[in-house]
Amino acid sequence: MKTFAKWLGTLLFALSFLHLPVASAASGYTQTKYPIVLVHGFLGWDNIGPYDYWFGIADALRRDGAKVYVAQVTAANSTEVRGEQLLAYVKQVLAATGAKKVNLIGHSHGGPTVRYVASVAPGLVASATSVGGVNKGAPLADIIRGSVAPGSFPESVLASIVNGVGQTIGFLSGDRSTQVSTAALGSMTTAGAAKFNAAHPEGVPRTACGEGDYQVTGVYYFSWSGAQPMTNVLDPLDAPFGLLSLAFKGEKNDGLVGSCSSHLGRVIRDDYGMNHMDEINQVAGLVNLFETNPVTVYRQHANRLREMGL
């Protein structure tokens, strides 16, 4: 019994080291030419007190040289409204830093949000990266929209609940923007995403599950996503993601977004052993012990941008 306990302890100790973000070979590993701006998804935030949406990611990037800014846009609204808010924030970052461009990284609904800015103001954007982005819509949004008629009483009840959640998140994170969850829902349906993509096609694959153009009007496009809804028995979101993944009917997904829908520009990977929240190192770092740490993925991407002169 003692031998087994010793063996188990040694194994867990070794696994803990495998899970740690890989240290940089030298200072400056993440030091991009242009500032990095992180953009949250639906019902997201920048930080609530000491708790960050991008759990441990911004600090890890800053540690080796990156200038990182975390945007706060409306938790629940259309891609275009969130995009205009982000554009205003980008201009503030450029004014504060003296930089000519930024590197945008958006998660979930943040993916289309950063794409909006890259599309309408390409001169201000060096790169746009979508992480688990709803670039071609999400089945859950389609199911909700198909089950709840626009303008109906059930829609008003559901919208009030979701708007209330958004307002609470906004209050706790210092944002007073108006929440319009019906607009957010419309943006994340397949039809809504298709309409947005027609107006802002940059980087969007022309095939169902291919890659998009790597560079358009001077902006480089990237994407990655997970494809494992359940990754850590201690994560309280694993069970809900496992249930929601049934809506994909066998298609690879992260619990909320299909792998093919996440594609934009150069696809780094669409099959990480991560669920939708693992992609931002949530909840509180409870991610897959047997997959690359999400923080490491962001550090590697910052280094990729650095090596490209971005």
Model features per residue range: what roles?
Residues 1-9:
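Bacterial N-terminal signal peptides that target proteins for export
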Residues 15-23:
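C-terminal segment of classical bacterial N-terminal signal peptides
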Residues 41-45, 74-78, 108-112, 133-137, ...:
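Solvent-exposed loop/turn segments at secondary-structure junctions
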Residues 50, 139-144, 232-238:
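Short aromatic-enriched loop/helix-cap "lid" or pocket-rim segments at secondary-structure transitions
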Residues 206-310:
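C-terminal catalytic-base region of ester-bond hydrolases, centering on the histidine
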Residues 192-212:
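Active-site nucleophile elbow and catalytic-triad environment of alpha/beta-hydrolase enzymes
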Residues 40, 68, 84-194, 254:
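Serine-dependent carboxylesterase/thioesterase catalytic core
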Residues 28-102, 150, 158:
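Active-site catalytic motif of lipid deacylating hydrolases and related acyltransferases
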